[in-house]
Amino acid sequence: MTTLAKRSNKQIYRDGDKLVKVFDESFSKADVLNEALNLARIEETDINTPELLNVEKLEGGWAIITTFIEGKTLEELMEENPDKEDEYLEKFVDLQLKIFAQRAPHLNKIKDKMHSKISASKYEATVRYDLHNRLEGMKKHKKVLHGDYNPSNVIVTPEGEYYVIDWAHATQGNASADAARTYLVFTLEGKTELADKYLKLFCKKADIAMQLVQQWMPIVACSESIKNIDSEQELLDSWVNVFDFQ
């Protein structure tokens, strides 16, 4: 097997026409099976995704085995062709809107997930109370949400087909939550100009008021804070202030 990526808690390999993602012991069996189940449910939609082939216990931990998708990530293409950034961003947003048009009624609900994240966060009770109330006031939708939609999770094949990978955080609910999450990812990567360009383009194409996406930003920032990444905390703390986007 060829090693494609090594992270602190998982390793990704290519084995011929298969991709093997091996999780360490910090991932419970339930976590791994949930990610596999998410992918299986997304396979039933019209979105191009890798095909789930197997889930098995290996020496290094539980593993998810899928088809390997040949190509480059959209992030790589944007870095290699900066003059085409706007063109790629258009494709990126169009694909996100296609995801939102899908339905997968058995996915977990975004509100349930976010309530759990808020409760587990480090913030004091008054802040958590305000965040819970803000979340409860959001409109309930049933759109498919990726949960970590960014250019590194979109693969473009040599034939020009677009595949979306890594559905570990998929839920169903309000599209503005997923847009806020994408905006946050760009911002945390230091790509503030791209983040702003993305948000404006998304709101225009989706015909969604920017304020509706901004209302989710304290909530998604709180959920991200659970990871306890020191370099992110100052920015996340500033976003979690529930008065920032009133």
Indicate residue ranges for each PLM-predicted region:
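Helix-rich C-terminal or lid/interface subdomains of diverse kinases
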Residues: R181-Q246
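Conserved short submotifs of the Hanks-type protein kinase catalytic core
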Residues: G60-T73
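Activation of the activation-loop gatekeeper triad in protein kinase-fold domains
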Residues: D166-A170
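An alpha-helical support segment within catalytic cores of ATP-dependent transferases
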Residues: A101-G147, I155-P158, Y163, L235-F243
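Internal "kinase-insert"/substrate-recognition segments embedded within catalytic cores
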Residues: D83-I110
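ATP-binding glycine-rich loop module of kinase domains
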Residues: T2-L33, A40
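Short beta-strand micro-motifs within the conserved protein kinase catalytic domain, predominantly
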Residues: E51-W62
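Structural motif at the C-terminus of the N-lobe alphaC helix and the adjacent alphaC-beta4 loop
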Residues: L37-N48, I99
